[in-house]
Amino acid sequence: MKTKRIHQRIPQRIPRIIHQIWLGDNRPKEWMNSFKLIYSDYEYKVWDETNIPALWNQDLFEREEKGCAKADILRYEILYRYGGVYFDSDMIALKKIPDEFLDNEFWSAYENEVYVPGLVNNAVIGCVPNIL
């Protein structure tokens, strides 16, 4: 995996917390469990309807009807508050991200250039708290 450093190293590292969100039924447990296995040295947190904290954008979250848009709001609020690494729940963990990724303030996945050139992806995000 090629990476390009755009930030200098900072004293605070991205916390070793994996965040995933699932709103609704039919949670893909096998896929989500792959993160618990691969990232066994990280805290693992699943956010769902039973444990959503009070949000700064609570009104927007409650008005939104689409689950994917609610998850977008929730992911940014959770990452801002706690920091860590967010992965969409429809992904399977095959291998850990390199530890040096935790030495940045923020990083995000980049979409495949062949299929969607120039698109930053929000399915995988890492950041320190209070950065977004």
Model-derived features with residue positions:
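GT-A fold catalytic core of metal-dependent nucleotide-sugar glycosyltransferases
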Residues: 70-120
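Substrate-binding rim/cap in mid-to-C-terminal beta-strand-loop elements of soluble/periplasmic
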Residues: 119-132
